[in-house]
Curated annotation (Swiss-Prot):
Keywords noted in UniProt: Cytoplasm, Metal-binding, Protein biosynthesis, Zinc
Database matches in InterPro entries: Ala-tRNA-synth_IIc_core, Alanyl-tRNA_Editing_Enzymes, Thr/Ala-tRNA-synth_IIc_edit, Transl_B-barrel_sf, tRNA_SAD
Organism annotation: Xenopus laevis (African clawed frog)
Annotated gene: aarsd1-b
Pfam families: tRNA_SAD (PF07973)
Protein's recorded name: Alanyl-tRNA editing protein Aarsd1-B
Length: 412
């Protein structure tokens, strides 16, 4: 049985009845991480909310006043995951997030159109696709799609949109002769009942459970951004449909305006200007590295030139890297001197190096790391890593001064 959202993809609400409600848990993404959330699985007599399937993400919306967090298909049922319980046999009004739904419809129907044209023009078969949050990707079974072919596919797709081609939804049985003629990647193992066909009139007929536009004119436009190398002998075609094209143009124009202001030139000169800046930065970084190395050597020589230099050397700099610290350690020598070197912000995070007699470093390296709330490792008289509490540096110095006072280090 098809859900109401599949029979009428443009319906935004539906009065229906709660069949069941059971406690459940589900992993939901929040801030890029998946966390297990407790809630309830709700079954309805029918639903206007599309459950995830056919490469299309699920809908969002409300059952009464209760937000629907996920909709998942389980066999013939659409399971609605919600945070609050709903009473069975209760009549409820189900509403969808139309902006999300229509976006998915535009991308999904756009994929059908691009897939059909790529096949009819060049015999490129679609092996999979992904409806992403920002852009969608069609995986084509070919190692190469040329720029000319991309342009031709896009041109024909937009021509069909301008021709106002109708899109029909039909249901057929698996024993219907047409079943073996339509494009398909197979039915789910738990599929039952009629097979749903999305028919773009005169262009394509394809098995699909997703929601689609009723006319290609509702796609507004299609823009193929380009291609990327896919899996072995496959090419990924990146595209946008409908409102996503308008949003992409708006973002691109705002970026162009910002770059024009920053670079003090016109859009046609942006690439050349950025290229010059990158080369200048690379040259400056190279010069800076040379100066840091020279500074490391001079710092070490200055310490060694002091008659009363002692057996402990401590230094902190905001600028530098691991190489800077290791050059100092190499130049001073660690057989008769204990060195504590740090790089970075004095109050937050940075890098550290403890170098000296292996016995001392091996014993106190982990303690230094602990005080600095860092992570690191050591061998051969050196313990280095990253520190999260550089503000604790003074505490480390006190500890190491006590170590020097209590442990005899042979000095030339």
């Amino acid at each position: 049985m098809a859900f109401h959202c599949q029979r009428d993809c443009y319906a935004t609400e539906l009065l229906t009845e709660v069949v069941s409600c059971h406690p459940a848990q589900l992993k939901l993404e929040n801030g890029g991480k998946k966390n297990t959330v407790s809630g309830f699985n709700v079954l309805l007599k029918d639903t206007v909310l599309f459950p995830e399937g056919g490469g299309q993400p699920d809908d969002r919306g409300f059952i009464g006043e209760v937000p629907v967090l996920r909709v998942i298909r389980q066999g013939p049922d659409a399971v609605h995951f919600v945070a609050s319980p709903l009473d069975p046999a209760t009549e409820v009004l189900v509403k969808i997030d139309w902006n999300r739904r229509f976006d998915h419809m535009q991308q999904h129907s756009g994929q059908h159109l691009v897939t059909a044209i790529a096949d009819s023009l060049y015999g490129f078969k679609t092996t999979s696709w992904d409806l992403g949050r920002q852009r969608s990707v069609i995986e084509l079974d070919t190692p190469l799609v040329t720029a000319e072919q991309v342009e031709a596919i896009e041109k024909v797709a937009n021509q069909k949109i301008r021709e106002h081609v109708p899109v029909h939804v039909r249901l057929i049985t698996v024993d219907d002769p047409e079943f073996d003629m339509v494009r398909s990647r197979g039915l789910p193992d738990d599929h039952a009942g009629p097979v749903r066909i999305i028919d773009i009139e005169g262009v394509d007929a394809n098995m699909c459970c997703g929601t689609h536009v009723r006319n290609l004119s509702d796609l507004q436009m299609i823009k193929i951004l380009g291609t990327e190398k896919g899996k072995k002998n496959k090419t990924n075609l990146i595209f946008l449909s409908g409102e996503r094209v308008l949003k992409y143009v708006s973002r691109s124009y705002n970026t162009e305006k910002t770059l024009t202001s920053l670079l003090k030139n016109g859009p046609e000169e942006h690439i050349e200007a950025v290229d010059k800046l990158q080369k200048s930065v690379k040259a400056l970084q190279k010069n800076n590295l040379t100066l840091l190395r020279d500074l490391a050597v001079l710092t070490a020589e200055n310490f060694k030139s002091k008659a009363d230099r002692g057996k402990f050397f401590s230094l902190h700099r905001k600028e530098g890297d691991n190489e800077f610290m290791n050059i100092i350690a190499n130049e001073i020598g660690t057989e008769d001197t204990l060195l504590f070197l740090t790089i970075g912000d004095e109050k937050t995070s940075g890098l550290f190096l403890l170098a000296g007699p292996p016995g001392i470093v091996e014993k106190f390296g982990p303690r230094v790391c602990e005080i600095l709330d860092g992570k690191g490792a050591g061998k051969c008289g050196r313990f280095q890593g990253k520190a999260n509490k550089m503000s604790q540096r003074a505490e480390v110095e006190v500890l190491l001064q006590k170590v020097i006072s209590s442990v005899e280090i042979t000095q030339e």
